[in-house]
């Protein structure tokens, strides 16, 4: 792609990226409020789980959330800048060292737990309090 085309694409993407989501990474437990359309009605459905992967690619960014529902592992990939995402709330900050947590697919029960990153949680809480003041 030529430099002109790349600059046009970059300008278009920056105009499309309007929503600010909270900072989260792999290992964090998040609640994603998703807009669901049923017939003529539209409602908001909460999807809570652990972020196991993120893909940072500008407008094409996405993240994968995994949860256990009735004993079965369920994963859902969300486009970060999608219109169906109403909001994202970070419940817990996880302390992990791997970039992608695909190994959680093979674990179950207590083995699939992730330690909480208390330092990051305290820093986030302090930032929220400073923002309100």
From Swiss-Prot:
User: Which GO MF term does the entry hold, naming one?
Assistant: structural constituent of ribosome
Q: Which Pfam families match?
A: Ribosomal_L19 (PF01245)
Which GO BP terms, alphabetically? translation
> Which PANTHER family does the record cross-reference, listed alphabetically?
LARGE RIBOSOMAL SUBUNIT PROTEIN BL19M (PTHR15680:SF9), RIBOSOMAL PROTEIN L19 (PTHR15680)
Q: Gene symbol?
A: rplS
Family, per the entry?
Belongs to the bacterial ribosomal protein bL19 family.
Q: Which PROSITE patterns match?
A: RIBOSOMAL_L19
GO CC terms of this entry: cytosolic large ribosomal subunit
Superkingdom of the source? Bacteria
The protein's organism comes out as Stenotrophomonas maltophilia (strain K279a)
Q: What is this protein called?
A: Large ribosomal subunit protein bL19
What lineage, starting at the top, does this entry show? Answer: Bacteria, Pseudomonadati, Pseudomonadota, Gammaproteobacteria, Lysobacterales
Free-text function comment from the UniProt entry: This protein is located at the 30S-50S ribosomal subunit interface and may play a role in the structure and function of the aminoacyl-tRNA binding site.
Q: Which UniProt keywords apply?
A: Ribonucleoprotein, Ribosomal protein
């Amino acid at each position: 792609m030529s430099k002109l085309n790349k600059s046009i694409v970059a300008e278009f993407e920056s105009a499309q990226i309007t929503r600010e989501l909270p900072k989260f990474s792999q290992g964090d437990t998040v609640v994603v409020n998703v807009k669901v359309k049923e017939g003529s009605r539209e409602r908001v459905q909460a999807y809570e789980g652990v972020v196991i992967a993120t893909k940072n690619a500008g407008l094409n960014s996405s993240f994968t959330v995994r949860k256990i529902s009735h004993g079965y592992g369920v994963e859902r990939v969300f486009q970060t800048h999608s219109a169906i995402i109403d909001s994202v709330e970070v419940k817990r900050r996880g302390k992990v060292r791997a970039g992608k947590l695909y190994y959680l697919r093979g674990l179950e029960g207590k083995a699939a737990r992730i330690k909480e990153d208390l330092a990051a949680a305290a820093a986030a809480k302090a930032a929220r309090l400073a923002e309100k003041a």
